[in-house]
Amino acid sequence: MIKAFADSMIKVFMPLIIYKASNNMLFAIIYLCAFEPLCALLNLVLKKVLQKYGVITIIIHFIPLIVVQFLLNLKITWWLCLIFALLMSLAEVLYYVPLNLLFSFTDRKVNVAKFQIATNVGKLVFIVLTGFILGSNFTNSLLIVTVTCSVLYLLSSIPILFGYGVLKKSYNKAVKHSRVVNTKSYKLFNLYHIEFGIFQVILEVILPLYLYINNLTFQSVAIIMALIEVCKIGANILAKFLVNKKLSFLSVIISISAMTISFAGMLISTNPLLLYIFSCCLGISFPLLFVPMFSSFIKKIVKDHNHFDGMTYREAYIFSCRGFLYVPYFVVPSFTAQFILGFVCAGCIGFTSYKILNDKKNKKQTIEVIPQRINE
């Protein structure tokens, strides 16, 4: 939760901060175009490091984030945006791959929802606070945010340090149980993760930018993003209930319906009130999709003893195609194309999710497992 406080102050507003500090949307787009593929690449490049020192990387991942925060106080240039992208992607990879691996071995579907709820609660207040701070005197307020954020990241590592022994034992156990799985059944999950990555980046990155350029202030964007977190909390509780009742596909159906309505609405209207409603609707759709599908993926990789490779490639696929989403902006400076793609992607996600959750052949087949030698 403490980490979520800090993330809400920097990660949520990073493209907006670059845009406002430079008064140039292209700098924000350059950052995003570099950030997404770098995340996919670093997942694969740092695979062995994450495999051996996963718990340590979770503890130290905030270091590049703190560097970014103080670099933000310099004059923004295109090459500085590339440095931001490299440091932010490094922090992303150092944290989420090992964390998801711990989930795959120690957690169950109920705890996926609980973790998401804690994250949403952590973001809620600080998104509003950051939006109002940055909406005032930008130069001084940015320094306040960066210093506060640095302190929070340091504090967030303390609980992990206290539980280091237990976490390391669980992590090493997960890595040792991992194997390389030779099966075509992961193709559906790979496709789903590409589609999910596109949806996620529209919700978490493009939506705040879209709201801001539609004449909404920093404060207004912050309020909308906070409302989205409130909606996510409720949706996580509902998703947890539906998954427990073995109604995962119903959760996905509700998610896809909300997603489709939201994208269609944003393409039709730019009315501020309707943007609030459609944004919240889009926020509701995220947990209702994430919780059942992530739980299904965990069940799959645990069954196949494919913990580490499964999680590593999951993250790589999620980030693999995101960079292409920003290319249309260089031709036409608007986000209409991204919302059209989101609308189409909603239907694709629904179809892929249906195939995964109802793949009877996959449930029955014996999967060939090839042991992987783990480097000591």
Model-assigned labels for residue ranges:
Residues 78-95, 194, 273-290:
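Hydrophobic core of transmembrane alpha-helices in multi-pass small-molecule transporters
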Residues 143-162, 338-355:
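Symmetry-related core transmembrane helices of the 12-TM Major Facilitator Superfamily/SLC fold
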Residues 88-119:
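Cytoplasmic helix-loop-helix junction between adjacent transmembrane helices
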Residues 1-40, 183-226:
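Helix-loop boundary and gating motifs at the non-cytosolic
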Residues 15-21, 125-146, 209-213, 323-342:
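Transmembrane alpha-helix termini and helix-breaking/packing motifs in multi-pass membrane transporters
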Residues 41-54, 134, 235-248:
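Helix-to-loop junctions at the C-terminal end of transmembrane segments
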Residues 56-71, 250-265:
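Structural signature of the two symmetry-related core transmembrane helices
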Residues 163-195:
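Juxtamembrane intracellular "pre-TM" segments in multi-pass secondary transporters
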